[in-house]
From Swiss-Prot:
<comment type="function">
    <text>One of the primary rRNA binding proteins, it binds directly to 16S rRNA where it nucleates assembly of the body of the 30S subunit.</text>
</comment>
<dbReference type="Pfam" id="PF00163">
    <property type="entry name" value="Ribosomal_S4"/>
</dbReference>
<dbReference type="GO" id="GO:0009507">
    <property type="term" value="C:chloroplast"/>
</dbReference>
<comment type="function">
    <text>With S5 and S12 plays an important role in translational accuracy.</text>
</comment>
<dbReference type="InterPro" id="IPR002942">
    <property type="entry name" value="S4_RNA-bd"/>
</dbReference>
<dbReference type="GO" id="GO:0042274">
    <property type="term" value="P:ribosomal small subunit biogenesis"/>
</dbReference>
<keyword id="KW-0150">Chloroplast</keyword>
<dbReference type="InterPro" id="IPR001912">
    <property type="entry name" value="Ribosomal_uS4_N"/>
</dbReference>
<protein>
    <recommendedName>
        <fullName>Small ribosomal subunit protein uS4c</fullName>
    </recommendedName>
</protein>
<keyword id="KW-0934">Plastid</keyword>
<dbReference type="GO" id="GO:0003735">
    <property type="term" value="F:structural constituent of ribosome"/>
</dbReference>
<dbReference type="GO" id="GO:0006412">
    <property type="term" value="P:translation"/>
</dbReference>
<comment type="similarity">
    <text>Belongs to the universal ribosomal protein uS4 family.</text>
</comment>
<dbReference type="InterPro" id="IPR005709">
    <property type="entry name" value="Ribosomal_uS4_bac-type"/>
</dbReference>
<keyword id="KW-0689">Ribosomal protein</keyword>
<comment type="subunit">
    <text>Part of the 30S ribosomal subunit. Contacts protein S5. The interaction surface between S4 and S5 is involved in control of translational fidelity.</text>
</comment>
<keyword id="KW-0694">RNA-binding</keyword>
Length: 202
């Protein structure tokens, strides 16, 4: 399944707020929500499916990519669900987004693809690159790159940067301090339901 490129508002109306996908938060009428809940008996499969879809759309990854991350998480030590979230959060496109360098993860992915982002002073144009503690993220030393990202930071770095990251406005440098903990995840998600969804596939 390819990466979703359709209307983003339609997705968040169905799944709820997904800050990685879009910064829009459409309001739903409570009467329509109550009516839809009363008219449908939501199955456990659907609940697990929707949690999986939240994860996929928020991080902007394909079905195959998400399944691969689940398989990696299963082989790692610790809680599979928590490791899965850590793997997704440490992607370069997501780290760029969480530092406030882009308004959304798709926007951050575009910056990475267009070679605006450096990791440890080396250009990295792979959005799925897995960042590690002590990696530092900087902007390519070109006026176009600096202009784009400076504008993004001015408008989108309003929310608090998570504890596992820091950003120096003076040096225009982001730093990965550590692997993030569960409380720093920027998405309302029940990752255990995602693991259950893939229990027969991974």
């Amino acid at each position: 399944m390819s990466r979703y490129r359709g209307p983003r508002v339609r997705i968040i109306r169905r799944l709820g707020t997904l800050p990685g996908l879009t910064n829009k938060t459409p309001q739903l009428k409570s009467s329509s929500i109550n009516q839809s809940i009363s008219n449908k008996k939501i199955s456990q499969y659907r609940i697990r499916l929707e949690e999986k879809q939240k994860l996929r759309f928020h991080y902007g990854i394909t079905e195959r990519q998400l399944l691969n991350y689940v398989r990696i998480a299963r082989k790692a030590k610790g809680s599979t669900g928590e490791v899965l979230l850590q793997l997704l959060e440490m992607r370069l496109d997501n780290v760029t987004f969480r530092l406030g360098m882009a308004p959304t993860i798709p926007g951050a992915r575009q910056l990475v693809n267009h070679r605006h982002i450096l990791v440890n002073d080396c250009i990295v144009d792979i959005p799925s690159y897995r960042c590690k503690p002590q990696d530092f993220i900087t902007i390519k030393n070109q006026r176009k790159s600096e202009t784009i990202i400076s504008k993004n930071i001015e408008f989108y770095q309003k929310s608090k940067i998570p504890n596992h990251l820091t950003y120096s406005s003076l040096e225009k440098k982001g730093l990965v301090n550590q692997i993030l903990d569960r409380e720093s995840i920027g998405l309302k998600i029940n990752e255990l339901l995602v693991v259950e969804y893939y229990s027969r596939q991974a």
